[in-house]
Amino acid sequence: MRFVDEVVIKLQAGKGGNGCVSFRREKYVPRGGPDGGDGGNGGSIYLKADENVNTLIDYRYKREYYAENGRPGEGRNCYGKAGEDLYLVVPVGTSVFDIDTNKKIGEVLQHGQTFKLVSGGKRGIGNTHFKSSTNQAPRKFTLGEEGEYKEVRLELNLLADVALLGLPNAGKSTLIRSVSEATPKVADYPFTTMYPHLGVVKVGVDSFVMADIPGVIEGAAEGAGLGLRFLKHLTRARCVLHVVDICPFNESDPVENYFAVEKELEKYSQELFDKPRFLVINKIDLLADKVEQKCQEFVEQIGYQGNYYTISAAMKKGTDELAKKLNEFLQKQE
């Protein structure tokens, strides 16, 4: 299924039903009083989060949504039926932005959580309500109000504990495959990963969610490559793994590659740049000798002061230990 994380839709809540003008007419009661009932309220439209949904693709092809109108009131003080509410099912982590103001107006972050997008119109009232001592046979009633209309943008930000960051072909997809049951495409060419993937990493009785996004290239913060579109999925992660290919097949410099990604991350969002971040040196199986020494030299060259991990995602070397350390970090954050 294609991954879609941003759509624009139009919403029209239901109109309220009109009030009714009616008078009681029964045998032996030829001039009964007013008995016109109220109309029904118009239906509203809600977002509803579902953990089993992971894309907004359904809203790419259908862009307009209408809630049901309320029914008009009837005689004998019968109220009209309220319009049925409409629920739009979306992935957990979906935010809503008003197109006119471009402001965020809501979000759904937990399974089953709802958020009202537009409100149904208020019902009209029947002539029963207008009876008075001076007007025993009122013909006055009110119309139901129009339902609210709004055009909104839905944006999905994946909810993950750990996000993978790095250049294309750094081995991020191989890493998430090696520690979870996620199955992103893996190949020896850049941009194999076209859309984000989530994987659940299990460590004993604990588990956490890891996200793999398309690789970042120079200029991503300005929209180059696929990076800009998907960097937003890192914003809700609790920590970021910067995955570096220590032995690039294109013979590029790992040091320059590291700083290129760090530069784009800082340009895109200072908040994201300040998140807890760990260095993962990948593809150590491709180093002919002195693996530990070469990795240490790389760390010194980039001036990295934090914890770092050396792995071969393809050979699953060091990946279990990495998963354990990440789980320990996440447990301490709770």
From Swiss-Prot:
GO-annotated biological processes: ribosome biogenesis
Enzyme kind, highest EC tier: hydrolase
Organism: Francisella tularensis subsp. tularensis (strain SCHU S4 / Schu 4)
EC numbers, comma separated: 3.6.5.-
Assembly behavior: Monomer.
One family name in Pfam for this protein: GTP1_OBG
Alphabetized UniProt keyword annotations: Cytoplasm, GTP-binding, Hydrolase, Magnesium, Metal-binding, Nucleotide-binding
Name of the molecule in the record: GTPase Obg
Family the entry assigns: Belongs to the TRAFAC class OBG-HflX-like GTPase superfamily. OBG GTPase family.
KW Transmembrane helix (keyword) present: no
OBG-type G domain: residues covered: 160-331
Residues the entry annotates as binding Mg(2+): 173, 193
Gene: obg
Annotated localization: Cytoplasm
Residues holding GTP: 166-173, 191-195, 212-215, 282-285, 312-314
Keyword Kinase: no
